Amino acid sequence: ASEVFEVDGMMALRDLFQIVGINRPDLHDPSHHPLDHPKLSDKRSIFHIIREIGPILLQHPYESFATSVERFLLEASFDPKVLAIKMTLYRTSEDSKIIDYLVDAAQNGKQVTVVVELKARFDEAANIRWANRLEEAGIHVTYGVLGLKTHSKVILVVRRDYNGLRRYAHIGTGNYHAGTARLYSDLGLLTCDPAIGEDLTELFNYLTTGYVPKRLYRKLLPAPKVLKPALLAKIERESEHAKAGRPARIQFKMNALEDKDITAALYRAS
């Protein structure tokens, strides 16, 4: 009871969406239009940009989903040097360009694999339709590991560069859904980091075959086996830094916090 407190005002801020729907343009702020990421304003191949500039952090909805993530997949589907595309699909929009680009890629001779989560809440029927369309296009569709829900949002592109094969990746916190990308606050990363590419290769092998990876992940922390122990270890590390008088900081961005062990660790750290 000592940890329960009252606040003045609303708790369910989502109810304010009803006010936004009122037809009073004179009371509305100007519409927000996502900006192109400054590093992606270059019209060269997005793969050249990622290779030369390095990892690109995306912040949606402030930065455009269309000119970053959708562009990444669009160019991958038509680039003659791209050999393969692998992707997880949890939720997408009815008028999804993502699906179109995957179909285009298959028709252009790329090897395309999509892991579709059929138990995505409220979108089960839609995902079955998407899976059928992808399979009809000749795309290899799998449905994840039995007993687990595939909630990760990742794309892996294998491209033949001037010096050999290179893996390009997108890792995001939000769905590949153009509509919610204009509303929800999410982060994404475009990168060709070799370690991340190798980790994603292992992850897709696991998601498509069920075989446990033969090596440890170097940079990714996939749930359910790796993420929680790693977070607890990192929280403890920062606690030890603080005790020793060294700089220490913990910053989390999350949709919700429900795990009791993580919560307890954060209390101890604070």
Task: Label every PLM stretch briefly.
Residues A1-I250, L257-D259, Y267-R268:
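N-terminal localization/anchoring segments of enzymes in phospholipid and broader phosphate metabolism
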